[in-house]
Amino acid sequence: MQYLEAKIEDLTDIISLLQDDILGKTRESITKDDFSAYKKAFLAIKKDLNNRLIVVKENDKIIATMQLTIIPYLTFAGGKRLQIEAVRVHSSHRAKGLGQKMIAWAVSFAKKKSCHLVQLTSNKERKEAISFYEKCGFKASHEGFKLYLK
């Protein structure tokens, strides 16, 4: 299994993984117009040195993805935290330990980048994901809020 930075040619497979989700199936699509928006976002992520879009490959096939963002902050006398986003594992590879390996890989990445903590959020509708993150050692220590602008 390989953990690699995503390339533009991986984008269609990444979008498919985003769709293969309780919420993604209604909000993600690969129409021509949508693909242009995904491509623009992908290129912006790649340009940002604090962002990594990771794909997990097995036998040259993408089976999982996640986005990692290093966030510098002033509190605690300054430091960095790693934000984990958009963790998706192909349905045929779920419940086989891959998600735990991905989180361990992300935590190792955070340590190499001298981050003080790793954080993530999960939609409250994703009960299984919340349970999974708790099993990985994450604590529900904060209440998150979002304000959608579009």
Question: Predicted regions: what is each one?
Answer:
Residues 8-9, 19-26, 33-79, 148:
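Acetyl-CoA-dependent GNAT
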Residues 103, 110-122:
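Conserved GNAT acetyl-CoA-binding A-motif
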Residues 90, 123:
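Residue-level recognition of the GNAT/N-acetyltransferase active site
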Residues 86-89, 95-108, 135:
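Conserved acetyl-CoA-binding loop-helix of GNAT-fold acetyltransferases
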Residues 73-84, 94, 141:
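A conserved beta-turn-beta hairpin within the catalytic core of GNAT-like acetyltransferases
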Residues 100, 116, 124-142, 147:
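Conserved active-site alpha-helix within GNAT-family acetyltransferase domains
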Residues 54, 63-68, 82, 87, ...:
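Conserved GNAT-family N-acetyltransferase fold
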Residues 2-16:
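A short beta-loop-alpha structural element at the N-terminal edge
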